[in-house]
Amino acid sequence: MRGILLTGALFLQYYVSAAYIELLKEDTLNMVEQLVEFGKDEKDTSVWDELAEMTDLYGNRMTASVQYSRSAEWVMKNVKKYTGMTAWTEDVNVDYWKRNEESVHLYVPTRENQMVNLPMLGLGQSVGTGPEGIEANVIPVSSFDELQTLGNKTIAGNIVLYNADFVSYGENGQYRFNGAFNAEKYGAVGALVQSITGYSLMTPHTGTMNPAGIPAAAITVEDSKLITRMYNRHMKAKQNPDIENAELFVAPRVKLVMNAQNYVNHTQQPNIIIDIKGSEKPDEIVILSGHFDSWDVGVGAMDDGGGAFCSYGALKLISRLPRKPKRTIRVIMWNNEESLSRGADGYFAAHKNELDKHIFAMESDIGNFEPWGIELMSKNATLLNLYTVFGNQYLPTIGGGNVTLVDEPPNVDIDPLCAYGIPCGGFVTLDKYTFKNPSTPAGFEGYFRFHHTEADRMEVLDPHQLRRNAAAMAAWAFMIADQ
Ligand SMILES: *[C@@H]1O[C@H](CO)[C@@H](O)[C@H](O)[C@H]1NC(C)=O
Ligand SMILES: *[C@@H]1O[C@H](CO)[C@@H](O)[C@H](O)[C@H]1NC(C)=O
Ligand SMILES: *[C@@H]1O[C@H](CO)[C@@H](O)[C@H](O)[C@H]1NC(C)=O
Ligand SMILES: *[C@@H]1O[C@H](CO)[C@@H](O)[C@H](O)[C@H]1NC(C)=O
Ligand SMILES: [Zn+2]
């Protein structure tokens, strides 16, 4: 997940009592009921097991890396085990951003080791510092307004630290995306960003940033607060040199080294596409999707191995049914979601003559915990009412049947399709740890504890939740495709 989530989105909950309507024809309902039953089979841990095998073998799937290619080959080999599926790849040009050696050291002269090594992660797309690095004082700010108030006089020649506490990804993400660009305007030589999370165990969180001429990196919440306290004590001591320990309160000063390199259009790598062809209208398409690329830390189990493999798992469940859906159900594992959306843009361009044949596009890219439902973007009120009834009537036993209306594309990869006017949905789950309704602004706090960190490993995910997600997504796809 990269994009800003649902800021200012419109949340409408529709409760339609529809016990009296039999909306699905019996033949469709039978298939949907079987998919729901598959979701209850406690012995089936295949979605988790397969994702574990692939990620154990190849590690992360950073776009343009060799691991991305090997993982994609693993899927293309795996898909041969299933009958009734047609799989192919569609290449797109991708840039390769390599972080290489990087570090932040904080000068604390009272410690035995005066250069304290801080865990950090350079932000994707950042320029490097060169091997010599840069050394400068750090000026903490909690907002862009504060940056502007301090202005060139205070900022020029220094490194800006954005230390805002976690509110939501949308609110805090602006400092990661635009922090360096804005700081540069006031003559800053670098930017540090407090990692975007409400809960930290000294884990830095990376993520992409908008182009800027100065380097930028994420540090942990703990170190962001340490630097802020040092700065505040230093300012106090400057105003009043008589306070106790004033001479010990040095200005926070760091050495930032980033050998990051960006290789434009380094290689061509695929979106992975897998179809179960429809029996009556094979040219009409319902998409289930997640992105296949990940960051270069952890293994991208949660972001977005879970979304990609629950989509794929859904298709495998559908392949076990006694008959095919009327329309084609297409799984897409998108490339390059985490930085430049070349996968989404490439698909849109390559399929521009058949966009009108796309009936629905779903993506799962905000965690796969207990199924909750879909965030629907559609101007069609009939469709909203219909899906609300579908979800409530056919999915309550495994969850995933709630429907909420949003007025912005719910996920990055389906964004072009949603914007084109294809009804689309983000598949969302009850948040890990907080179990909050996902349509509240901070409803994804548990997800963001792991997002873009070394800790995004298989242990974040639960095999039974993944199976239920796959079954719920399969049921949605089948209901829509069989209409
Ligand atoms: C701030 O400093 C930058 C870099 O030194 C300079 O380009 C810019 O014009 C300055 N802006 C203001 C408002 O002084
Ligand atoms: C890289 O690829 C993109 C998209 O495929 C293209 O628009 C761009 O012109 C290419 N850039 C270079 C430097 O080749
Ligand atoms: C709205 O959705 C309904 C139900 O799927 C469909 O029958 C109808 O054609 C749609 N209307 C438009 C304008 O797309
Ligand atoms: C809707 O979400 C709630 C949890 O917020 C869950 O208990 C319920 O089963 C869901 N409903 C459906 C129809 O999936
Ligand atoms: Zn993602």
PLM feature segments, named:
Residues 21-24, 33, 40, 52, ...:
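Noncatalytic luminal/extracellular "stalk/propeptide" segments of secretory-pathway proteins
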Residues 23-65, 205-207, 293-294, 360, ...:
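N-terminal capping segment at the start of a domain
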Residues 31-41, 56-67, 136-141, 165-180, ...:
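Second-shell loop/turn segments in exported
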Residues 65, 116-218, 299, 403:
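Extracellular/luminal Protease-associated
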Residues 121, 125-151, 208-301, 320:
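Soluble metallo-hydrolase cores and metallopeptidase-like ectodomains found primarily
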Residues 216, 224-225, 231-232, 281, ...:
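Metal-dependent peptidase/peptidase-like ectodomains
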Residues 272, 284, 288-341, 473:
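Alpha-helical metal-binding/catalytic segments enriched in His/Glu/Asp
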Residues 327, 434-483:
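His/Asp/Glu-rich mid-to-C-terminal helical/loop segments that flank catalytic regions of hydrolases
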